[in-house]
Curated annotation (Swiss-Prot):
<keyword id="KW-0847">Vitamin C</keyword>
<comment type="pathway">
    <text>Pigment biosynthesis; anthocyanin biosynthesis.</text>
</comment>
<keyword id="KW-0223">Dioxygenase</keyword>
<dbReference type="InterPro" id="IPR050231">
    <property type="entry name" value="Iron_ascorbate_oxido_reductase"/>
</dbReference>
<dbReference type="GO" id="GO:0009718">
    <property type="term" value="P:anthocyanin-containing compound biosynthetic process"/>
</dbReference>
<comment type="similarity">
    <text>Belongs to the iron/ascorbate-dependent oxidoreductase family.</text>
</comment>
<feature type="binding site">
    <location>
        <position position="308"/>
    </location>
    <ligand>
        <name>2-oxoglutarate</name>
    </ligand>
</feature>
<comment type="function">
    <text>Involved in anthocyanin and protoanthocyanidin biosynthesis by catalyzing the oxidation of leucoanthocyanidins into anthocyanidins. Is able to synthesize anthocyanin pigments from leucoanthocyanidins in aleurone tissue. Converts dihydroquercetin to quercetin in vitro.</text>
</comment>
<dbReference type="GO" id="GO:0046872">
    <property type="term" value="F:metal ion binding"/>
</dbReference>
<keyword id="KW-0408">Iron</keyword>
<feature type="domain" description="Fe2OG dioxygenase">
    <location>
        <begin position="218"/>
        <end position="317"/>
    </location>
</feature>
<dbReference type="InterPro" id="IPR044861">
    <property type="entry name" value="IPNS-like_FE2OG_OXY"/>
</dbReference>
<keyword id="KW-0560">Oxidoreductase</keyword>
<feature type="binding site">
    <location>
        <position position="242"/>
    </location>
    <ligand>
        <name>Fe cation</name>
    </ligand>
</feature>
<feature type="binding site">
    <location>
        <position position="244"/>
    </location>
    <ligand>
        <name>Fe cation</name>
    </ligand>
</feature>
<keyword id="KW-0284">Flavonoid biosynthesis</keyword>
<dbReference type="InterPro" id="IPR005123">
    <property type="entry name" value="Oxoglu/Fe-dep_dioxygenase_dom"/>
</dbReference>
Amino acid sequence: MTDVELRVEALSLSGVSAIPPEYVRPEEERADLGDALELARAASDDDATARIPVVDISAFDNDGDGRHACVEAVRAAAEEWGVIHIAGHGLPGDVLGRLRAAGEAFFALPIAEKEAYANDPAAGRLQGYGSKLAANASGKREWEDYLFHLVHPDHLADHSLWPANPPEYVPVSRDFGGRVRTLASKLLAILSLGLGLPEETLERRLRGHELAGVDDDLLLQLKINYYPRCPRPDLAVGVEAHTDVSALSFILHNGVPGLQVHHAGSWVTARPEPGTIVVHVGDALEILTNGRYTSVLHRGLVSRDAVRLSWVVFCEPPPESVLLQPVQELLADGAGKPLFAPRTFKQHVQRKLFKKLKDQQDNNAAAASNGMITK
C-alpha cells in the first residue's frame, strides 16, 4: 500500500460507506460518539448544557477592578475546567484569516504533492505531513491527517518542512508564531498572578531562569489537524481522548465544530464563540502548579458532511534544560505535598508515550486472553 493510500483523506475521498476496523473505536467508547455537527446543534439548543468559560483578557492591560476580575476569571477557568475561550487576545483578524486560508490551500493540494513534506515516525522524525503522531493506548487509528512543525523560535525551525505552496504559508505562519509567543507570555503572567505569585514566575520556570546559565525560549509547535468527512462518525474519532504535554495550547478552527472537553464527568461540546480562540492548560503547567491548574482531557470528533480543520500551537518548555516540578511557593507553610516528581519535559513526554504503549500491550493481552486477535 502506498503512502497516498494510507492517508485518511484518500480513504474519505474513495467514497467508502464503512470504515476499516483499525479506525473503529472500542465498544466502551462508542456510547457518546456521534456526528460533530449534530452534537454541536444539540448543545446549542440546550441552555442547561455546561459551557466552556469565555474570558476577555484585554482588561488585563488596564489598572483597577477590570484587571483583577480578568485574573480571577482566568484562574477559575484554569482550575475548574483547564480550558478557556479567550477574547481580547490581540491576534488580528486578518492574520488569522490568512493563516486559515494558507492551511486550507495546503490541504487542498493533491495528496501526492503534500507527500513531499511527509514525516517518518519510525525513524523518529515526527515533524512534517502525516496521519498519526504517536501510538494510542487503544491500538486504533484516528480519522485525521495533519501538518506538524516548529513555528517558534524561527532560527530553530526546519524550514524544509514549511510548504512552499501556497506561497503565503511561510510568511503568515512566521507572523502568527511570533504573535502567539507574545500572547503566551501574557497568559502565563495572568495565570501566575492567579496563584498569588509574581507575574513572571511561571514563564521563568518554563524557560529555566532558575537554573544557572539557562535562559532558553519557549518552543511553539504548530499542528494543523485535517479531519476529512467520515461515513461513520458514531464509530471513529479525529483525535482520541488525551491531555496535551505542553504548558499551554492555543487553538483556532475553520468554523466546523468537533472539540469536546471532559468536565464534571461528562463530555462537553465546545460551542462557537465568535472572536475567541481556545486555550488548553497542558501537563507542564499542571506539574508546575501542583495540580492547581488542570490539564484538560479532550478529544476531536468528526462529521459525515463537513471537513474540519484546526490549528493548534503547543507552547512547550525546552526539552532537556528545564526541570519541571511544583513551584516551591505553592508548597510552603504546609500548603501541600508535591504531587509530581521532578522531570525534564523530554522525560515527561517519554513517560507518557511509554504509558500509552504499555496500556496498548495490556489491552492486546486482555483481548488475546478472550480469544480476540488484535493488530
